[in-house]
């Protein structure tokens, strides 16, 4: 499975926040970042590859560019993925995770319901994640990092707390996340899948 996140197609301000984006595009001979990113990613991902996108696909009308991305894509909803965009992604065959999905043979479902009962509906809808075993690792995939030490993200602390409870309930080994771009949180259980820290190459799990 290939993993990408925070493509932010059409998000011109992101080129100011993360100048490495346009620098990388120009280094590869492109002036248009979206054109660069789509072609670059498609060099690594083929049409039949299973792909997990960890959120924040596109801004404004650039969401329609998503149909150019290769792969059989599952999207874990991020904070910038609007409902109009999600409806379009569904129409082009993407699978959408917009809640808590646990793909384990055994876990305490009753305990999960007790955990969920402590949170309001907005927090639950904002906490999209997938837990599954790959090889000998139990992984929680999410848009937000489970153990987030970035003070800028204090507004997401309810989501973070819920993610931590799910991580502990499922006895996960690692968290593969997006959202933080070039910032890497201090907790080594969190693996940043963002393009900026991976030379714009999709991560891969076997």
Residue ranges and their predicted role:
Residues 50, 72, 189:
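Residues at the starts of beta-strands that form the adenosine-phosphate
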């Amino acid at each position: 499975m290939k993993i990408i996140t925070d493509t932010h197609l059409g998000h011109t301000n992101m080129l100011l926040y993360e100048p490495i984006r346009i620098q990388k595009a120009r280094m590869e001979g492109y002036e248009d970042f979206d054109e660069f990113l789509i072609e670059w990613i498609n060099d690594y991902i083929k049409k039949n590859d299973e792909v997990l996108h960890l959120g924040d696909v596109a801004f404004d009308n650039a969401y329609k560019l998503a149909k150019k991305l290769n792969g059989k894509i599952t999207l874990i909803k991020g904070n910038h993925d609007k409902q109009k965009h999600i409806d379009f992604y569904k129409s082009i065959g993407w699978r959408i995770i917009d809640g808590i999905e646990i793909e384990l043979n055994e876990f305490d479902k009753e305990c999960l319901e007790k955990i969920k009962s402590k949170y309001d509906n907005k927090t639950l809808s904002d906490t999209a994640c997938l837990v599954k075993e790959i090889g000998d690792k139990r992984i929680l995939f999410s848009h937000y990092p489970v153990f987030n030490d970035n003070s800028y993200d204090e507004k997401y602390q309810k989501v973070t707390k819920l993610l931590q409870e799910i991580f502990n309930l499922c006895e996960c080994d690692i968290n593969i996340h997006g959202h933080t771009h070039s910032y890497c949180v201090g907790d080594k259980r969190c693996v940043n899948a963002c393009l900026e820290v991976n030379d714009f190459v999709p991560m891969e799990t076997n």
